[in-house]
Amino acid sequence: MINIAIDAMGGDFGEKPIIEGVLKALEAKPFNAILVGNSKILKPLIPKKLEQYIQYEEASEIFSMNGNATDALKNKETTIYKAINLLKEKKVDAVVSAGHSGASMSLATLRLGRLKGISRPAIATLMPNIVNRTLLLDVGANTDCKAENLFQFAIMGEVYAREIMQIQKPRLALLSNGEEECKGNELTKESHQLMKKIPNFIGNAEGRDIFNGEIDVLVCDGFDGNVILKACEGVATAIFQLLKNEVKQSFISKIGALLMKSSFKKLKKHTDWQEYGGAPLLGVNGCVIISHGKSDSRAIKNAIFQAINFSQSHINELIENELGKYNA
């Protein structure tokens, strides 16, 4: 059975939504959950029928959301340090954390190391499009990149899309300010030339192309990716609020909204980041899923499912093999 270490106390809302997410995941499929935190606080939250799937790793401190990621290595008593250490010692197959994302990334990179051929890891996230989903990377691990980094991101994203998203030939694109090969800054132009070696590379794409369903993997640096991610979260929230405001304007609008209630629910589910769980940190020697600090139990449950799928798919080995084809 898969062993998953969960940073049980690292999110914005404490241990309750995290434990609820673990329990929901266990009710759906069996796995061993290693809860990292204060067992005196955590044990009362576990029902007896699921106790057989739960173990505890004691950790006395939580890495502050206001802390500096560079300090993550200094305190070995934090929940995220101990969770990553379990993975390093191969006592677990994956780590899920809704704590400080910078600390998670720093610890994973420095404690686990990078995959062969990878110079920098990347955070990948799923974005809704009109057909299904688009994988966007990097969304925050690296604000400044070289062309070789973006090329490596492309390979990692392609493998992830093929193995986890089950897309046989994922369409891969590079974010730019125009579709033409000559568009973009020097980084984009140089990266484009490297990515032309990849058979599934379809060229440059603009920001709007994330949502048209014609791209499966979109590559960019962590600065642009994070701006896109946060902007999309804001736009989605604003659109639903505008719809609510308009519905309240008249009785006819309220009737129309009632008739479309089912469609609105489906739309909300498709665009809700909680449905996507977390973001895998690709390129490190292990499986680390970084969840949003504001994750509810549903997001934690889905992040755990991501971790299980990642662990069972042997993605890291496949990434190294794929990169080896180009480095030979």
Curated annotation (Swiss-Prot):
Molecular function (Gene Ontology), one example: phosphate:acyl-[acyl carrier protein] acyltransferase activity
Cell location: Cytoplasm
Pathway stated in the Swiss-Prot or TrEMBL entry: Lipid metabolism; phospholipid metabolism
Enzyme Commission number: 2.3.1.274
SUPFAM superfamilies: Isocitrate/Isopropylmalate dehydrogenase-like (SSF53659)
Top EC class of this enzyme: transferase
The keyword Transferase is annotated on this UniProt entry: yes
A GO term from the CC aspect: cytoplasm
One of the protein's GO biological processes: phospholipid biosynthetic process
Pfam families named among the record's database cross-references: FA_synthesis (PF02504)
Keyword terms: Cytoplasm, Lipid biosynthesis, Lipid metabolism, Phospholipid biosynthesis, Phospholipid metabolism, Transferase
Catalytic activity: a fatty acyl-[ACP] + phosphate = an acyl phosphate + holo-[ACP]
Quaternary assembly: Homodimer. Probably interacts with PlsY.
Role played: Catalyzes the reversible formation of acyl-phosphate (acyl-PO(4)) from acyl-[acyl-carrier-protein] (acyl-ACP). This enzyme utilizes acyl-ACP as fatty acyl donor, but not acyl-CoA.
Family membership: Belongs to the PlsX family.
Name of the protein: Phosphate acyltransferase
Species of the source: Campylobacter jejuni (strain RM1221)
